[in-house]
Swiss-Prot record:
Its EC number is 4.1.1.39. It comes from the Bacteria. It comes from Hydrogenovibrio crunogenus (strain DSM 25203 / XCL-2). Induction: Induced by growth in low levels of dissolved inorganic carbon (at protein level). Belongs to the RuBisCO large chain family. Type I subfamily. GO terms for biological process: reductive pentose-phosphate cycle. Optimum pH is 8.0. This is Ribulose bisphosphate carboxylase large chain 2. The lineage of its organism: Bacteria, Pseudomonadati, Pseudomonadota, Gammaproteobacteria, Thiotrichales.
Amino acid sequence: MASKTFDAGVQDYQLTYWTPDYTPLDTDLLACFKVVPQDGVPREEAAAAVAAESSTGTWTTVWTDLLTDMEFYKGRCYRIEDVPGDKNAFYAFIAYPLDLFEEGSVVNVLTSLVGNVFGFKAVRSLRLEDLRFPIAFIKTCGGPPAGIQVERDKLNKYGRPMLGCTIKPKLGLSAKNYGRAVYECLRGGLDLTKDDENINSQPFQRWQNRFEFVADAVDKATAETGERKGHYLNVTAGTVEEMMKRAEFAKELGQPIIMHDFLTAGFTANTTLANWCRDNGMLLHIHRAMHAVIDRNPNHGIHFRVLAKCLRLSGGDHLHTGTVVGKLEGDRASTLGFVDQLREAFVPEDRSRGVFFDQDWGSMPGVMAVASGGIHVWHMPALVNIFGDDSVLQFGGGTQGHPGGNAAGAAANRVALEACVKARNEGRDLEREGGDILRDAARNSKELAVALDTWKEIKFEFDTVDKLDVG
């Protein structure tokens, strides 16, 4: 029976959008929200309100509802579950018909699902925990410009993680000194170097000058070592037009890879750039600057696994994922859950990793996970074990903080990486025997011995804020 508020012309959402008997279709887009309702609001009503506001609903009855098939287009909350260890919150599972979304548009999906409902008064807090994209939608998205295998073929690097470094200091260097730092790191043994997220085109270093000096450094290191090298040239800019101009110049210089800050620049810019990279044979490295503003609060926002899925659809060949062991936030199980979403063709539901739905990616190429942030040689065994071969391990301060300089720091990391990969291939337990593996390798590498001594006391032992809700 309708409530008094419904009689007064205000929607009782539960009557229309709470459908516990509904069985989701393979073509439905599924969402899991963590909901904390306002005091006095029943769970079913709060969940239905989320389904309504993120699909077809409005606050009152309108006569134009009669001009379309609301039963076909509405979002449906089909299940509610308790959140382990939190009596105030619950999970709301909502199914959305595919026709609510523009083909190939991550922008439209996010606008619908999180664009307005997060300010809704019926809920105290709201978090989008996971999405299940149907294959029918995935097939309309371009995805990564190259993918993992094509990147390995382009760079001729197989059987191990790639080794990288963010140039430090991230701001303040002249273009010439910046290029010199790139050259030393690549000559010393790194595969890739990187612009930091906030180096664009500042007065101390205009982008075109940086690109030219970096290209010279990459070409020189490639010629001297006989290995294919690269540097992520950050093309992020204030306008899409300027971004594309920078991308075109990187291509003219013969560089293999460019970089983009996908959250601060936006998904429209990112998809535009990814499509261009696909058409022009360029690799695309993605930085997640601003992600923690959105995903770190365990009760409100969007979990990073959702952002990672959206990035795979929008397009990128690398994505920063945290390190588990370094200075940045990252629960191990949860991190592995969204790393799987980046790389695998099919990811089964696994609540122990925060995966709420089976996700079939079809034939969409994978994205390399990038571990970066407060890591050094002592972390190498754990990083190789956690992230596996299809990853980029980036040591910024852990390369350039070496007492012997950038080239020595790069050499130390390269020796450590190859020692860990060799030990793993021999069946050794990297996380249990890692210290011994590194010390043995250091007997034949002065650079590694110095690095091990330099960073032997450095740890980041803060607890994770955003932990998995498991019983």
